[in-house]
Curated annotation (Swiss-Prot):
InterPro entries assigned: 4pyrrol_Mease (IPR000878), 4pyrrol_Methylase_sf (IPR035996), 4pyrrole_Mease_sub1 (IPR014777), 4pyrrole_Mease_sub2 (IPR014776), rRNA_ssu_MeTfrase_I (IPR008189), RsmI_HTH (IPR053910), SAM_MeTrfase_RsmI_CS (IPR018063)
Source species taxonomy: Bacteria, Pseudomonadati, Pseudomonadota, Gammaproteobacteria, Pseudomonadales
Function: Catalyzes the 2'-O-methylation of the ribose of cytidine 1402 (C1402) in 16S rRNA.
Originating species: Pseudomonas aeruginosa (strain ATCC 15692 / DSM 22644 / CIP 104116 / JCM 14847 / LMG 12228 / 1C / PRS 101 / PAO1)
Major subcellular location class: cytoplasm
Protein name: Ribosomal RNA small subunit methyltransferase I
Length: 282
């Protein structure tokens, strides 16, 4: 008997009209749907008249319950994986189940659809050819600032998810770490009634959110323009700096700079000067 297929199905992030006909067909035809929160997903199913059984698959039970879904798949049944909203695995559960299925040779098929970070990026007015997604920042201030400092000189557009009750604190930390003039965008409640997309320098964006408690509600995506070197100064980039720091911990300064240049393609002299600064020898 051949194994079934695991379908990774995107669902709407707000507006139910955004679900695709293919997603509806798959959800109706599979034997079982693994859902992040069955209580949430049942409302989607009731709206569209889907009667497929639901079973919980969330961050607290995914490792233990994954075998249940794998057994159904190995028995020849098709299973769909959904999150509460958007595309599964994007800051949502499902990674362990997908990895286990892949390891066992079970076919995994994506059914594309809504994704908050992509929707936000498409309307943000920030460079979209190169970007990085950092997911949710740590809840505690020290961890949050450390994560932000790690991407302080990242030239690509930065994208974060944030819980509404931490939005103001995170914007304050972004302002302090990245600088108040760095351009940022708050994309809130996308595709819903109170959708908001606001682009301002970080200092102004923080103050605007602080002045209106309504902006501290709902699902939030924060996008920040990538770092730009001062005019006339060549950019190194966060990844090259990370490589340099790792090598400096193991090698003499000159060798570390030379090897970092070979790995990253950044000019050796530029990395050498940065290494001097990092070791306090400039």
């Amino acid at each position: 008997m051949s194994a079934g297929t695991l379908f990774v199905v995107a669902t709407p992030i707000g507006n139910l009209d955004d679900i695709s006909p293919r997603a509806l067909r798959v959800l109706r035809e599979v034997a079982l749907v693994a859902a992040e929160d069955t209580r949430h997903s049942i409302r989607l199913f009731q709206h569209f008249g889907i009667e497929t059984p639901l079973a919980a698959c969330h961050e607290h039970n995914e490792r233990e319950e994954g075998g249940r879904f794998i057994s159904r798949l190995q028995g020849g049944e098709d299973v769909a994986l959904i999150s509460d909203a958007g595309t599964p695995l994007i800051s949502d559960p499902g990674f362990h189940l997908v990895r286990q299925a892949q390891a066992l040779g079970i076919r995994v098929v994506p059914v594309p659809g809504s994704c908050a970070l992509i929707a936000a990026l498409s309307a943000a007015g920030l460079p979209s050819d190169r970007f990085i997604f950092e997911g949710f920042l740590p809840a505690k201030a020290a961890g949050r600032r450390s994560r932000l400092q790690a991407v302080q000189e990242e030239p690509r557009t930065l994208i974060f998810y944030e819980a509404p009750h931490r939005l103001l604190e995170s914007l304050a930390d972004m302002r302090d770490v990245f600088g108040g003039e760095r351009r940022a965008v708050l994309a809130r409640e996308l595709s819903k009634t109170f959708e908001t997309i606001r682009s301002l320098p970080l200092a102004e964006l923080h103050d605007w959110v602080a002045s209106d408690s309504n902006q501290q509600r709902g699902e939030c995506v924060v996008l920040v323009a990538g770092w730009q070197a001062p005019e006339g100064e060549e950019s190194i980039g966060a990844e090259a700096l990370r490589v340099l720091d790792l090598l400096l911990a193991e090698l003499p300064l000159k060798k570390a700079a030379a090897l970092a240049a070979e790995i990253t393609g950044v000019r050796k002299n530029l990395l050498y000067q940065q290494a001097l600064q990092r070791q306090g020898k400039s």
